[in-house]
Amino acid sequence: TDDIFSDSYPTWNKNGEEIAFVSDRGSYVDGEFFGRIEEHNYSQTDIYIVNINNAKIKRVTNTPDNESYPIWANSERTLFYTSDYNGVYNLYKHKLVETSKNDSALNEAYAITNVLTGLQQPTISKDDNSIIFAGYSGVGWDLYSLNNPLDLESKKIEPTNFINTRDDEDLTVADIRDTDKIERIDLNTNSKYSKW
C-alpha cells in the first residue's frame, strides 16, 4: 500500500498471493483519497486483503467495531481475527466465498470465543488443528489454545455493559492530580477486593 492510511498486522495466505491486513482506510480501497485526513475516522479498523499480483485491495469486514490480528487458515479459504463487537476482543471465524465477480463475499463472520477479558495475537498451527492466543487472566497475560477452530460453532456473545451504556455515560477525562476528586480506599477494611 502507498497511501495516507495506517495498515498493520500483515499476514500471508498459504499460496503467497494474498496478504490480509488491518487498516483504518474505510471504503477507500482504490484510487486516491481526496478528503482531509483530520475529517476521516481513523480510530476504527477493518480487515482487508491485497492481491500481490494486481495490487487490488478488497474489504473483508465492514462493521463499526474494531477488527484486528487476521490469520489465514491453511486448509481452506478462511480468516480468523479479533473483534471488539461486544466491547471485549473475541476471536471470529470468517469463511471467504468467491462470487461470480471473483470478489470475496462479505459473509457473516461469527464469534468462536466468548471471553471476559479479551484476547490478542492469535496464531494457527500449520495443520489448522490449533490456535494459540494471548489472553488476560488474573494479573497478567497468558497463552491459551483452542483446538479444531475450523469446526467450532458460533458463540452467542452479548454486548458488555460498557457497550450498552457508552452513549449514556459521561466519559470525560478527569485530572487525577486534583486530589479532591480521588476516592480514597480504606486499606484497613475487610474488603473482598485486593489492596493492589
Language-model features: locations:
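Strand-loop-strand
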Residues: N107-Y110, N114-T117, S125, S130
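Outer-membrane beta-barrel initiation region
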Residues: L150-W196
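NTP/phosphate- and nucleic-acid-binding module
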Residues: N51
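Short coil/turn segments that connect the beta-strands within blades of beta-propeller domains
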Residues: N15-E17, S75-R77, D127-N129
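A flexible loop/linker signature enriched in serine peptidases of the S9 family
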Residues: T1-S8, F21-Y48, R59-S68, Y81-Y92, ...
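Short, solvent-exposed loop/turn segments that connect beta-strands within catalytic domains
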Residues: R77, E98-L106
